[in-house]
């Protein structure tokens, strides 16, 4: 497993809105 175990973070791009789901 890598370090991509974040169901909250989905493809975050620079300048885009961070979907963390707060």
From Swiss-Prot:
Cell cycle keyword on record: no
Cofactor(s) in the UniProt record: heme b
Stated pH dependence: Optimum pH is 7.5.
Keywords: Cytoplasm, Electron transport, Heme, Iron, Metal-binding, Transport
Cofactor comment text: Binds 1 heme b (iron(II)-protoporphyrin IX) group per subunit.
Signal peptide annotation: none
Region of interest (Disordered), ranges: 1-22
Top-level taxon of the source organism: Bacteria
Subunit relationships: Heterotrimer of alpha, beta and gamma subunits.
Functional summary from the UniProt entry: May transfer electrons to the iron-sulfur centers of the beta subunit of chlorate reductase.
Protein name: Chlorate reductase subunit gamma
Species this protein is from: Stutzerimonas chloritidismutans
